[in-house]
Structures are given as structure tokens and as C-alpha cells.
Amino acid sequence: MSDIIKLTAAEIAAKIASGELTAVQVTEAHLARIEAVDEKVHAFLHVDREGALAQARAVDEKRERGEKLGPLAGVPLALKDIFTTEGIPTTVGSKILEGWIPPYDATVTKRLKAADVVILGKTNMDEFAMGSSTENSAYGPTGNPWDLTKIPGGSGGGSSAALAAFQAPLAIGTDTGGSIRQPASVTGTVGVKPTYGGVSRYGMVAFSSSLDQGGPCARTVLDAALLHEVIAGHDPMDSTSIDAPVPAVVEAARNGSVDGMRVGVVKQFRGEGYQAGVVQRFDESVELLKSLGAEIVELDCPSFDLALSAYYLIAPSECSSNLARFDGLRYGARVGDDGTHSAEEVTSLTREAGFGPEVKRRIMLGTYALSSGYYDAYYGSAQKVRTLIKQEFERAFEQVDVIVSPTTPTTAFAIGERADDPMAMYLADLCTIPTNLAGNAAMSLPCGLAPEDNLPVGLQIIAPAMKDDRLYKVGAAVEAAFVEKWGHPLIEEAPSL
């Protein structure tokens, strides 16, 4: 394995800025890694080799001219295939958008380019971000670099797998019910769901508009903070974008501390269904926080037990509306366009061929929940539960600065193990969904390996909305303490591919 691909994003940016490395050298090293291992991992759906090298050459030329470089100049990045990229395919893991090349960049894509980040390509994902394992991709599953027979999480398993396989030091994901944090947890990486509205959704293909949020993925807390600062900020193109200063996440990541902080532990985030090794590593993390000077506060949030049920009414309802735009007439795949079918028949045939089973399941569920006579009983009730969850978070944050929990109830499960059991699959997001419903910020970072299977366990940190900096302050302190304890970052234990 090349020494270059072991570097953090912060180290790469510093070495390129000083001239110790060129952006082309760094990009070529990561492209070589992708070529060497991605046949096994399948993290990428599209590798833009020529585009990445062109971006890298532009960074090197900019430096030679003495021009100011972007904050992550020359650092390679893997982009989840849910963000539009001008001239590069965007499939959202679906056959219905196979071959679609967007005519414009998402705001996140634009901001990455403005920061001189080198986009290596687009990563695999569950179709339309609906899944917890990246098995629902129309283009095949992604393997977990720790054990290729295991899932890398979902929906953004391609992004987390690319990080764990050292194919890129940075990645972008999206989080609707845990799709950044859950993959980070099972691959031993860092993933952050910013405050809802903190990162623009313009050009991000919609699943559930009131829940979707883009965010940074990395192998270290500082790298995630550097990326967070690049992509965050108000965007007039997104009506849900928050018009407020971006929290000082990089400063927080450089000054990690929990001394004197009140840290909440929620009673509902443990019990039946939680793997013993996950609970053990979480309990050790709580003891670590105590040793670092934090005060632990027990919290009771009974409405959190209803979060999963509420989510699986709200998200499918919004998805059934959002996916109505894929009609086979305006863009993407088109089936039955031979002059013998009506427009309505073309739409029906296109959706039947283009959407996978999980997407169809959620569209039907959402349509039913919104239907006349059932709206109040299902969607309306779910929104009331959502309000209760928000209120319980608000009361909790009157007592504590942050809340911690396991990120997922179990470590990575085997590919195919839960394919025929949707409920078992949905339970993977048990700890992450409440945060999405409330719009708060959350992070997952590695807290060790489960003794039973030697697979990564994630610690989730939750902060109030627009207090994203607290995630990084706590996360950096915990990360430093664990690295000192282990003698090296957890990710260095990942088996060689």
C-alpha cells in the first residue's frame, strides 16, 4: 500500500501546499488504489480518471503561479452518486437514471470544486438512498473492507467503503435516517450528519425532503471538520438552507475537550436487539468520557421508542411524492417509447422496469399513508410523534451539552442476511433516526472492535441544532483518547485487501 494513501486529508493538503507532494502524485496514488482493489470492494459506480487528473493538474499549476489554494487543495474525494455532477453520470443507484448525465453541478459539488478538492468519482449506494446495506443498488452490492462478506452500511456504503479501503481520504454522503452515520459505524470511519439545513440540498436527488441532509465522511474527526466547513453554508437555491454563520467546526476539532461538559445517556438506546460487544464498547466509551472530565447524565426519552415507526411513515410518504417526477418522459430511462403506448403507459412501464423492489415498497407504503381516509391515522399521527421527539430532545438539551449512544445496535451483518426481512434491515437505524426527525446534528466515530467478531463499533454523539461544533469538540477528545489507548487509529487494523 502506498504511503500517500495512508495520509489524512489535512496532511495531504499541507504537503501539497508546501510542495512536498503534487496533487497529481496524490491523485495517481489513489486512482491506482481504486484500480487495485475496487473489483473486490465495488465502492465506485463511476471513476472519473481523466477529470480527476485534470483537476489535480489545475491545482499544481495554481500553486506554481503563486495563487491562493483552496482549503483542501488537491485532496481526493469520493462523491456519493446522489449529487449532480455536470458531465458525469448520476444514477442514484437506480436503473431509472442509468446513463443520465446532469447538465449542472449540485451546490455541494460546486463548493468542492471551489475548494480545489479532486473528485475521483461517484460511489455506490442503495437505490434512491433507500436502504441500510448498499444491497439495494441496481448495480450490485458493495463489500465492507474489514470483511468483504459483510455489508458496509447504507445507504452510502460506497462512500464509507472507499474510506476504509484507503481509496480516498474524504467522501461525501447523505443522511435521511442514518445513511452517513451507520456506514461510518460499521466501517470504522467518521461520519457527520450536520444540522438539517446546514448543507445545501440543491442538486441532491430527493428522497425525503424534510429529512435529507448531506454531510462529510472521513477517517479522522479533523478531516471531517475541514470538509464540513467547505460544504456548509447558506444557499439561496435551497429553501430549507439556514441563513446563519457556519459553526466553527475546524476550531472545535483542533481543540477537543469534554472537561466540564454534561453528557447524556438515553435509557432507550439499549436493550433487546443490541449486540453484547456493541454495548460493551459503548459502556467503555462512557467511562472514557468520565475519565476525561465529563459528567454523565441519565436521560429518559420514551417517545424515541416510536421514532422508527414514525420515520417509516414520514419518509415513504415524502418519497412517494418526490419520485413521481421519474415518469420516463422528461429524463432518465424510458420504456415502451415505440409509438404504440400512451404517455401513461410509458410512465407505468418505465417505473416497473426502472425502480427496484425496495423503492417500490416505500412508494406504495407512502401512497397508502397519504391516501384519503388514512392520512390522519398514519401520516398525521407520525408527524405528532415527530413533534414529541423534538420536544424531548429540547428538554434533554436543557440538561446536557451532548448525548451519546451506540450508532448501530450491531456490527456489520452478512451480505444477504437481512435481504428478505425488511424489519430487521430497518432496525439498523434504530439509534440514528431520532436525530433526523428532530433536525439535530450528529456524528459517528469508531470506539473499538466488538470482541465477538472483531468488527468496528461506532459511538454516536448528538448535539442541538446549529451546535455542530460540539460534535467535533467531543469527537476530537474521544478520538485522541482512543488513539492513545490503542497506540494507532482503529482504521489501521483494517485487513489488507
UniProtKB/Swiss-Prot annotation:
SUPFAM superfamilies hit by this protein: Amidase signature (AS) enzymes
Catalytic residues identified in the record: 80 (charge relay system), 155 (charge relay system), 179 (acyl-ester intermediate)
Keywords annotated in UniProt: ATP-binding, Ligase, Nucleotide-binding, Protein biosynthesis
Entry's Gene Ontology BP terms: translation
InterPro entries cross-referenced by the UniProt entry: Amidase (IPR000120), Amidase_CS (IPR020556), Amidase_dom (IPR023631), AS_sf (IPR036928), GatA (IPR004412)
EC number in record: 6.3.5.7
A single cellular component GO annotation: glutamyl-tRNA(Gln) amidotransferase complex
Oligomer and partners: Heterotrimer of A, B and C subunits.
Family, as annotated: Belongs to the amidase family. GatA subfamily.
The protein's name in its UniProt record: Glutamyl-tRNA(Gln) amidotransferase subunit A
Gene, per the UniProt record: gatA
